[in-house]
Structures are given as structure tokens and as C-alpha cells.
Amino acid sequence: MHDQQELANQLSTGSAHAGCILDEPATQRCTQFLELLYTWNKVHNLTGTLCRSEAVSRHLLDSLSIAPLLKGRRHLDIGAGAGFPGLPLAICRPADQWTLLDSRGKRVAFLRQACATLELTSVVAVHSRVENYRPTENFD
């Protein structure tokens, strides 16, 4: 089992290679997100990833790898599920506005709890099917 510092080091090094430099508070938020995900996953089966180290590389770093490609400031994550890629990207780019859309209530409940716990005020989790969703503003 990996400790928090090992995961933080893996995340810090990997995010730099992915082109999304995380400062220490952002790295800490990502590892907190991972712990929250694992706590919820025991009951709600949000992701099938086996170990935390794998989750860093398969989920967090994969999500962060698209950060340099994003244009604009308003983003929509359709089928947000367990929060990938939306939540890691929101941690990496906190000045942007993020809407995480999912049709399953348990996932949206997790996303809302994660946003509250991590104090991600630029993120809104919406419980809706994409074909029924009517945003009040356009996304970039």
C-alpha cells in the first residue's frame, strides 16, 4: 500500500510530464479526492481501479494530460461518473467553470460531496441525462 507522500510524489512528477503543473495544495486535493473516491467506492462501486498507485496513473494523470489542450473557461464533462476527467481538471484549473453531468444519482451525490470536501467552488454537479439537460449558458 502506498502512503500519501508516495502518491503525492507520483502525482507531482506525472502531472509535470503531462503538462499540468500542480502546486502542493492542488496535489494534496488530488490525493484527498482519491481517498474520498476509495471510501465511497467500497459502498457504491464508482470505479474498478485496483490500487491507489494505479488510480493515480490511470485516472488522475490521464485526466490531467488533456489540460494543455483545453480552450476557454467553461467546460462540460458529460457522463462524469466518478469525476474523471472533470474533478482533476477543476483542481488543476480552478479559475475555470466546470459542470459535471451524470444520469446516476449516486455518482452525482459523490461528485457533490467531493466538491464540498475539496472546496471546489467552480464545479457544479448536475443530475440529468444529456438529452434532457438545458444549460443556462454555453460551454467553450
Question: Which role does the model predict for each range below?
Answer:
Residues 61-140:
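Conserved SAM/SAH cofactor-binding pocket of Class I
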